[in-house]
Amino acid sequence: MANLMQRSLPLTTTRTPVLQFLRFRGKINIQRPKEPHYERARVVAVTQPKYPELPKARSCFQTRAERTKEQLENPYNEIIAREVRNWLNHSQLVAIFHLNSITADEIFRVRVQLHKQNLHLKSYGRKIIDQAVTGTPYEAIMPLFHSNHCIVFSPNQQQIGALLKITRRVPQMVLLGGIVEKTLLSRNELMAYAQMPNLQGAQAQLVQTLNLAAGQLVQHLQTHQANLVQVLDVHAKGNGDTNTNTTETADES
């Protein structure tokens, strides 16, 4: 019955039209678009904003300085700056490294190895470092923070050997300088400081040198007395032998 109705009434069947979209123009030129219509161009020209023109006498550097001056100081930066200042004041060893391209996993492994040796790896922004060292004896380290960097703090300056041993296996960390016992040292001076013996060894060597000098002094003071005693002993033995020979000759006579 349905087939009969479809044959008798062809309008009852639904057919989906086949559509195909075609572009009869070339590619859209984004870099050099076609000029808009006159009416549209006039509307665009009217709606464009007008900015106040700066005087020609003002340079770009002055404008940038004014923009920087207008920025408000972040209180959190002051907190981090106090933390950096606290690390600098309570650390006997501060090593500054230039940090090349390195993955997060590698820097994490280095941080763990340093932490086992009581060495703490930190990284701060240049603005925070500047805020922390301004007006302090550490202001001379600012030229070392012009690029990506990291800092290692330690309360024991004798850990310089362990620090160099760990960072020698990480070529991405380049030693620039450091602070040892409130004294700024270069890279070569830090390397030389690491080759020096520890404090206990130096004290033992000093005690040995002092004992050797005291022993030599006593020996030199007793030299003449010992020589005199030896000469007198030889002289006494010589006189005794002479007296013995004289007595024997007298008895034979």
Swiss-Prot record:
Ribonucleoprotein keyword on record: yes
Keyword Ribosomal protein: yes
Primary location: mitochondrion
GO biological process assignments: translation
CDD domains per the UniProt record, alphabetical: Ribosomal_L10
Keyword vocabulary terms for this entry: Mitochondrion, Ribonucleoprotein, Ribosomal protein, Transit peptide
Highest rank taxon of the organism: Eukaryota
Cross-referenced SUPFAM superfamilies: Ribosomal protein L10-like (SSF160369)
Residue range of the transit peptide in the UniProt record, numbered on this chain: 1-24
GO cellular component, one term: mitochondrial large ribosomal subunit
GO molecular function, one term: structural constituent of ribosome
Annotated compartments: Mitochondrion
InterPro entries: Ribosomal_uL10 (IPR001790), Ribosomal_uL10-like_sf (IPR043141), Ribosomal_uL10_bac_type (IPR047865)
Recorded family membership: Belongs to the universal ribosomal protein uL10 family.
Binding partners and assembly: Component of the mitochondrial ribosome large subunit (39S) which comprises a 16S rRNA and about 50 distinct proteins.
Alphabetized PANTHER family for the sequence: 39S RIBOSOMAL PROTEIN L10, MITOCHONDRIAL
Protein's UniProt name: Large ribosomal subunit protein uL10m
Species, as recorded: Drosophila pseudoobscura pseudoobscura
